[in-house]
Amino acid sequence: MKVENQTIHFKSLENMKELSDESIELIVTSPPYWDVKDYGGDQIGFGQSYNEYISSLNRIWSECIRVLRPNGKIAINVQPLPIPSDRSGFNRRIIKNIMVDIERFMWKKDLYLSCMFYWDKSAYISNVSWGSYPNPTNIASNTSFEQIFVWVKRGSTRSIPKDLLKKNLLRKEEW
């Protein structure tokens, strides 16, 4: 599949196989939140162990890396996953930082972390719960933010003709 100046949206790994190697400049994605949220259908993570979930994500990352051009970027939007007490192994709710496992995989595949952004959702979510009144024994922080990590595939920056750059400059009003 030849792609030039287009937006493409795939819902599954299988559809990405249609894309040629090193044909995409930018990928923006947000993986399902493991077994924490049911999106319906055959989503990755739901009903899987954490290790199975990470293996499934790694297959997706491999395919993303295959289609990324050298110096291409992949922006991954994730949030720390709240794991309920009945599944945590600690007899209490815990937070699992999925980015640790994603980062390990990306480093092995020779991508580097270019930048990080934090999406503050605190205006929409109450931040902290102090336990039960009147005995607040535990602070249970709500994950009121998401992280966006931008990974870059090793390689030279693609040369863009000057006339094309000039044609696509933003006016100050557009900026």
Tell me the role of every PLM-derived stretch.
Residues 1-175:
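Core catalytic lobe of class I
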